[in-house]
């Protein structure tokens, strides 16, 4: 048997669908068919046409269907059929690639006005970003990067600043946002009740993302206590021990250095290290309970995680507020930090950070 007879792909080139195949007859064949089920061509071990490929993986226990073109026609579905034949058994399968209006959704991102790293507001009542967020703000608001015709297709980013009011933030407020960034906000200003509501907001929908700062011992402690639930292993540094090198390359972090939309033509160099702006940052120590489920992207001089993602929980762990700054700081070069406020992607640092937000954007658009 197979897990599904209909595969629905996103509108983008490279969108994939998976069919699990349960059979002892792993030499089964594949053949294109028309809308009436009439076979076309001859049976084969893989299929390819102008729009889709169908290939076997894992000794035939999986079929991977991949879109070869974008479907950008409003209201249209691109449909193709194929047949699986295993001796006397035949199974008719349909592929649909839908135009996806979600791709043009505007992403609503909240950060907090009283904390370092505040991203500012770019809609009614526009306000500037705090100095440690000017580089990232430029990347997010430049529609060459994130926009209807951008590298990542979406409606763009609405950045909204909110004032903190310990234990008085509401569920209704959080519900307005797709992404919440708890920037460098003092622990006294973001209470345990706020943290609990934010955690519930995150768990309620699969297309919401939390960015959690852990830059110092006096910020985000109520949030960390909520999302890590008694786990330990975060260390806070108050001296500059050097830059933040890439974590060891794995399938889990390859997106940010190589496979993501901002690095497909020019990957991040393997010896890249992001500059460590000042003496303060936090690290989630590896092989501790706090690090469980987190894929490392950047490591700190203390051997812990400065930037990482928990994919299953949709949490980005952001250990240094200054990663989003365009200011030089300690040990800066033209390559090792975001070096402009216009959002120009012109070095390894900007490509890496842009890919992190590409993953965030795709999760908001296509999280299920």
Report each predicted region and the residues it spans.
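Short, solvent-exposed loop/linker segments at the N-terminal edge
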Residues: 1, 6-14
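Surface-exposed binding patches on compact interaction domains or structured appendages
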Residues: 1-2, 18-64
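A short beta-strand micro-motif common to beta-rich folds, especially ectodomain repeats
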Residues: 74-88
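C-terminal edge beta-strand
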Residues: 89-101
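Aromatic-Pro/Gly-enriched surface loop or interdomain linker
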Residues: 101-179, 324-325, 340, 354, ...
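Extracellular ligand-binding/catalytic regions of CAZymes and related secreted enzymes
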Residues: 102-104, 111, 115-121, 235, ...
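A glycine-rich, often tryptophan-bearing local segment used as a flexible ligand/cofactor-contacting loop or short
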Residues: 134, 186-276
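Catalytic beta-strand/loop cores that center a nucleophilic Ser/Cys/Thr
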Residues: 239-330
């Amino acid at each position: 048997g197979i897990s599904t007879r209909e595969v629905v792909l996103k509108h983008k080139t490279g969108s994939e669908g998976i069919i699990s195949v349960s059979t002892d007859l792993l030499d089964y064949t594949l053949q294109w068919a028309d809308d009436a089920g009439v076979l076309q061509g001859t049976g084969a071990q893989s299929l390819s046409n102008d729009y889709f490929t169908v290939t076997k993986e894992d000794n035939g226990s999986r079929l991977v269907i991949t879109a070869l073109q974008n479907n950008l026609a409003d209201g249209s579905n691109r449909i193709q059929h194929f047949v699986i034949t295993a001796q006397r058994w035949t199974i008719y399968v349909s592929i649909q690639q839908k135009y996806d209006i979600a791709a043009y959704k505007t992403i609503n991102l909240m950060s907090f006005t009283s904390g370092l790293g505040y991203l500012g507001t770019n809609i009614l009542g526009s306000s500037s970003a705090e100095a440690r967020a000017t580089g990232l703000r430029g990347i997010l608001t430049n529609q060459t990067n994130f926009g209807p015709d951008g590298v990542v297709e979406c409606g763009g980013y609405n950045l909204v600043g909110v004032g903190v009011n310990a234990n008085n933030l509401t569920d209704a407020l959080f519900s307005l946002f797709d992404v919440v960034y708890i920037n460098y906000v003092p622990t006294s200003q973001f209470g345990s009740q706020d943290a609990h509501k934010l955690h519930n907001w995150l768990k309620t929908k699969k297309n919401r993302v939390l960015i959690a700062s852990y830059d110092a011992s006096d910020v985000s402690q109520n949030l960390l206590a909520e999302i890590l639930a008694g786990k330990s292993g975060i260390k806070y540094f108050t001296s500059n021990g050097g830059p933040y090198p890439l974590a060891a390359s794995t399938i889990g972090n390859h997106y940010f250095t190589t496979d993501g939309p901002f690095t497909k033509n020019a990957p991040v160099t393997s010896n890249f290290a992001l500059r460590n702006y000042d003496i303060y940052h936090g690290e989630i120590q590896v092989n501790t309970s706090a690090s469980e489920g987190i894929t490392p992207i950047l490591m700190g001089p203390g051997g812990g995680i400065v930037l990482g993602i928990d994919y299953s929980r949709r949490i980005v762990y952001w250990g240094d507020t200054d990663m989003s700054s365009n200011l030089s700081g300690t040990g800066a070069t033209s390559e090792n930090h975001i070096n402009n406020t216009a959002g120009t992607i012109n070095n390894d640092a900007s490509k890496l950070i842009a890919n992190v937000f590409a993953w965030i954007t795709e999760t908001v658009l296509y999280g299920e």
